[in-house]
Amino acid sequence: VVLVQSPLRLSEDSEPEPDLMVLKPPLDRYREKLPTPEDVLLLVEVADTSLEFDREAKLPLYAEAGIPEVWLVNLKENLLEVYRDPRGGRYREIRLLSPEEEVSPTLLPEVSLRWA
């Protein structure tokens, strides 16, 4: 299930709207309630002017909530920043990929993407 710019319920008072989320199926479960961190397989933010805000404000929230993997499409530097292994409010694994490199989501290893 893929949702674009839809709210994600992190807590009672936090509902950011990531640019894209890949969620556990079925789609019907999200008709009546917002997705929560447990539903997220992959979250993607696309950032140009919001790059610093996404890194400094959103990433710690996502890590604290246990979102397993976040991809930050860094348009300023033409990089894909891959954040994995959330622990203690931050991501322990960070990879920077150039456009020609391929990447596979941790929870969907059979999918290989060239991100550019």
Predicted segments with their positions:
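C-terminal interaction segment
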Residues: 3-65, 72-116
